[in-house]
Structure formats: C-alpha cells, structure tokens
Amino acid sequence: MSSEENLRLMKNLDDAWNAQDWESFSQLHKDDVTVRWPAKTPTEGIDAHRREAEYFFRAFPDNHIENDPYKVLFAQGDWTCSVAEFTGTHEGIMIDPDGKSIPATNKKFIVDFCTVARWKERKIVEENLFYDLVGMMRQLDLTWKLV
C-alpha cells in the first residue's frame, strides 16, 4: 500500500469515529489489532477496541477528533501519524481503574490527540494513541483520581 492510501484510510478511520460508524471503524482494524492508550494495558482485538470506543462515547457523547484538516498528518511506509484537536464534554458515567463509577462533571476538555498506526492490507494492525491525560483530567476537575 502507498503512503497516500494509508493517509486516506487514516482520515476514514477518524471520520468513522466521529460519526460513531462502528461497522466502518471495525473494518479498518485487523481482528487481532493491538491498541495502546495512555494509562491502561493494551487492548487486544477489534471487538474489545470497539467496546471501549462505544464506552467512551457514553461518557463523552459529543467527543470529536478534528481531522478536517488535521494539525499534522504524515506517513512513512506502513505507518501513519496524525495529530488532531480532541474535544468533548463529560456527560456520562466513567469507570475508574478500580472499577468505581465517576459521575458526569459536565466539564469540557480540549487536548491534542496523536495516533501512530501501522497498516497492513488496508487495516490497522497496531495503534498507539497519545494525549495529555493529566491535562484532560484537570479540565474535567478529576485530578483527585490521578493520585
């Protein structure tokens, strides 16, 4: 696959996220994809990744990745890298790492969001997601959860 094709697929992926088009989102990942998020163990498999994506939308129903245009978007070989503005409002329940419910704060967040993805046969096989989790939690008035 060409770098240009991978860049187009990356935009399609974020379009699917923003539209909550989970069928397209799933089709752009290999079944055995590995996804790394800040402050959690890697997610293995598209079914688990789709569940966590749907969960995130329940906690932040208006979350959005600004990908038209991206702040940064480039490719090298099988890899793509994107940086986008990521926004949302905490309107639903979150579950902390200990399994406790965190009620909605109704606070907004805005952070840069970076995705570094490796593509094979038009699908992501490895996805690394980076964003300022501490900054996000501060904006949501949830810094006490970081201690």
Task: Name every feature range the model reports, one short phrase each.
Residues M1-V147:
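C-terminal and inter-domain tail/linker signature
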